[in-house]
Design a protein with these regions (language model features):
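Pepsin/retropepsin-fold aspartyl endopeptidases
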Residues: 1-140
């Protein structure tokens, strides 16, 4: 059995907190750790990221209320909606459109992740390799 070789950009996935994390880079070069969940249809940034980037996010986003949830929880909360948020994953540009940013503290976030990412990233590419042995995500 052959597997996809490790890309030149190296490993960009880690397993921590019993969950997969993607190492990404924001447009300003800042390193981000994002919870990677293929069961998640839309990406979002957590309050911790908002708190550290409040002025720039407030300037480019629009406030709105959303209702959503997950396993055994439904909430309505205020978010900031960004028209576009660009990152790089393994040196590959990714654009996340209509990104929700959590502006309220106190949710279930327990790690130091900047946010969550899932199928809205995966669906942008023709070929996505998730190699858990070598711990990398390759987007083509």
């Amino acid at each position: 059995v052959s597997s996809t070789p490790l890309p030149a950009s190296g490993r960009n996935m880690i397993l921590t907190d019993r969950a997969l994390k993607i190492k990404a880079e924001a447009n300003n070069g800042e390193r981000l750790k994002l919870h990677f969940d293929t069961g998640c249809s839309t990406a979002g940034l957590y309050y911790r990221y908002y708190e550290g980037h409040k002025s720039e996010l407030d300037a480019s986003g629009k406030r709105e209320h959303i209702t959503g949830g997950g396993f055994n929880i439904v909430v309505t909360k205020e978010i900031l909606r960004l028209p576009s948020f660009r990152i790089k994953v393994g040196k590959v540009p990714v654009e996340l459109k209509n990104l929700a940013v959590d502006t309220t503290n106190g949710d279930f976030q327990t790690s130091d992740d900047a946010g969550i990412i899932g199928m809205d990233m995966v669906n942008q590419f023709d070929c996505v390799t998730i190699n858990l042995k070598e711990m990398f995500l390759k987007l083509e």
